[in-house]
Amino acid sequence: MLKSLNARAVSLVTWGIEHSEELGLLTEKHPTGATLIDLGIKAKGGIAAGRFMTEVCLAGLGKTSVTTMSYEDVALPSIHVETDFPALATLGSQFAGWQIKTSDYFAMGSGPARAIALKPKELYQKIDFSEKSENAVLVLEADHYPTEEAVKYVAEECETTPSKIYTLVAPTSSMAGSVQISGRIVESGIHRLTELGFDPKKILYGCGYAPIAPIHPRAAKAMGRTNDAIAYGGVTFYSVDSDDDTKLKELVHRAPSSASKDYGRPFYEVFKAASFDFYKIDPGLFAPATFAVTNIRTGVTHASGKINPTLLKQTMQLVPA
């Protein structure tokens, strides 16, 4: 039987604290007693910190590596992610599905603490999973450390004390932040297939890669680039067990970002046109550029989508020397 998600993540976090100098992390005790790990606010962070953050988000049930990939005539650093526990690692842990919202703080939360608090409950019902754990590991995309009120809220939702909370935090406009968002490539595809009606428990294996967006000092621009990295450069592969190959083919056809009505412009432009309201954006845009899904019952691989180097160059402001 697998060790609990939070127990696995605590083991990783403990290792990270021991190697904080190599990873460029800063660790301190929060006023509430929680353990705070900074990967890019005051800390230097970096690519290794981003990989570490990604693997903590996956609760140790996925592996990452960074290499350079060619997107037609453009070569970009890219993160590769793989997992043999796709639904549990991604939807059960990595998915940024918890809004940490108090009177003095806001951030999107991911990581295995979600499995204790069941955020969101409907998603955990789909994967038939929940967890009880004294320790809780939460990853925040934020420009500021969580406030005392925010940490106490998390502890209350996880039915534990603040001293048992481990919080990792990095801004989108940091190297670690950019790496870990591109590191959601496999998760974004699984979430999209799930939203289209596929049972995530039937996904047996997942891997993929996406370019790591160059850092932009403006948070909104950085967020746009990181979303574009997945939507216009993200490549995914899955093995599934489906008894309906015709339906699977239809779902895969609808899954890539190119099927979205908002496809074809940098995300920042789409976001701005939507008055910076995520809920006005077609959910189909939050998907990888390509899918390849093999049905182990038939041996058929259904493929869809396309890489868009032109949009990648535009959003990342790649200017020839």
Q: What are these model-derived regions, one by one?
A:
Residues 1-158, 163-187, 191, 195-321:
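Anaerobic metallocofactor- and corrinoid-dependent redox/one-carbon enzyme cores
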